[in-house]
Design a protein with these regions (language model features):
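Short hydrophobic beta-strand element within catalytic cores of glycosyltransferases
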Residues: 318-323
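A charged, aromatic-enriched C-terminal amphipathic alpha-helix characteristic of glycosyltransferases
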Residues: 16, 356-397, 408
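Nucleotide-activated donor-binding/catalytic signature segment of Leloir-type glycosyltransferases, i.e.
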Residues: 247-249, 256-284, 335
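Conserved acidic donor-binding segment of nucleotide-sugar-dependent glycosyltransferases
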Residues: 334-345, 353-359
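Acidic donor-binding loop of glycosyltransferase active sites
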Residues: 287-304, 317
Length: 408
């Protein structure tokens, strides 16, 4: 029997962006490797076939049973999804081990081909982040960054500290589904599926604020201006446009933001200018809720890359997002499928511009279709993962570190 591919990550039903990412990535990695099982070693709340829920970071030595399970399964490769909070042990004093347990795990499985996919790599690294990436990159065969700027900024960050730059970094973009494009007729049906056809005042055209409600997702920037924007659009085009705000909260720390944003939307709803739709942003309903919108606004104030944006791209939906904002800005420039704003006035202008210009929306949608088909489709990304796996296996076999060219 062929050796399995092992993913290490949080996993559903946990309401976590990395868990959702892993679930989707696993699907397409499995399609690319039908001869192998793709298994997951997850935290203790992970569930499902082929999932081993054994990561318990309440124990300092959580990594030991994980290393034992990896060796027991004898994998083709280990693929680790990384976010600092996922592998963080907190001692009885409330002190973090700063992912030391994860570094111990990498040393314990150094005989196994391993790649790691960090989901937070800032353009300007903190001392802690730089130290972790330095140590991690020396214990791993291949490091997978999401964006090209992260790789060339890493060189700048490390040279500024007089450190050697890791040469085993490969750029593999955040995957987006190639099978979630809907026709206009299907969008009408989706409104019915979601029950939106029963909202009497809901306009035929919708601007979407969709996804997890968090303090960094500043819905209030748009909601505070929406009444004026909607009137301006109507005066110019004679068309009615509404704001569709949809999602829910998952982090108790963000519940006050949820309450505030929702109350602002409900005030607009009383004026028949908006509608709030509560749902858990994962699975098909996430795509369907975005699909009924003409375009999406993603007003994020802190994000390196975005699962929400990946879904926007999958649907070929024009969008507006904040800049400069790490991967959001990079993918907007690369795709030509979105507009960027740095001020409230820019956001107002862009929303009105997109609502009044169907030709621009169609052009940006075509740009996103091309970007999806040629760059970020999960089918393409899964093949790039396969290339990384081969590099990791060859490095483990020969003992020669992977060395890839710099961006610049």
């Amino acid at each position: 029997m062929a050796q399995p591919i092992i993913m290490i990550s949080s996993y559903p039903p946990r309401l976590c962006g990395i868990a959702t990412f892993c679930e989707e990535a696993r699907e397409f990695i499995q399609k690319a490797h039908p001869e192998r099982d793709v298994l997951v070693i997850s935290h203790t709340d992970g569930e499902g076939e082929g999932v081993f829920p054994i990561i318990d970071t309440s124990h300092r030595t959580w990594w030991k049973p994980v290393a034992q399970k990896i060796h027991e399964l004898d994998p083709y490769v280990v693929h680790i999804e990384h976010e600092y909070g996922l592998y963080n042990y907190i001692d009885e004093r409330g002190k973090s081990d700063e992912n030391e347990g994860l570094l111990n795990l990498l040393e314990a499985v150094s005989d196994v081909p391993t790649v790691m996919e960090p989901h937070t790599v800032h353009g300007r690294l903190t001392d802690f982040e730089a130290d972790f990436i330095f140590k991690m990159s020396r214990r791993i065969n291949v490091v997978l960054f999401k964006c090209h700027y992260q790789k060339w900024r890493l060189d700048w960050n490390f040279r500024g500290r007089d450190w050697p730059t890791p040469m085993n970094v490969m750029v593999v973009p955040h995957g987006a589904r190639p099978d979630r494009r809907y026709s206009l007729a299907e969008v009408v049906q989706l409104r019915e599926d979601l029950g939106l056809d029963k909202v009497e005042h809901l306009a035929p055209h919708l601007v979407g604020l969709i996804g997890w409600i968090q303090s960094n997702k500043r819905w209030d920037i748009l909601t505070s201006m929406w009444e004026d924007i909607a009137h301006e659009i109507n005066e110019r085009t004679g068309e009615d446009w509404d704001l569709l705000a949809a999602g829910t909260w998952r982090d108790p720390n963000h519940k006050p933001d949820y309450d505030r944003y929702r109350s602002e939307v409900e005030l607009l709803e009383q004026k028949r200018l908006a509608h709030y739709y509560e749902f858990v942003p994962r699975g098909d309903v996430y795509y369907k809720t975005m699909a009924v919108c003409d375009f999406i606004v993603l007003p994020s104030t802190d994000e390196t890359q975005s699962g929400t944006l990946a879904r926007i791209i999958a649907l070929n939906k024009p969008y507006i997002t904040t800049a400069p904002m790490e991967g959001l800005t990079a993918q907007t420039l690369e795709s030509g499928g979105g507009l960027l704003f740095t001020t409230r006035d820019m956001l107002r202008r862009h929303v009105i511009e997109l609502a009044c210009n169907e030709e621009a929306r169609l052009r940006m949608g075509e740009n996103l279709k091309r970007y999806l088909d040629e760059v970020v489709s999960w089918e393409i990304v899964a093949e790039q993962y396969s290339q990384a796996y081969e590099l990791a296996r060859e490095s483990t076999r020969t003992g020669i570190p992977v060395e890839l060219p710099k961006e610049f």
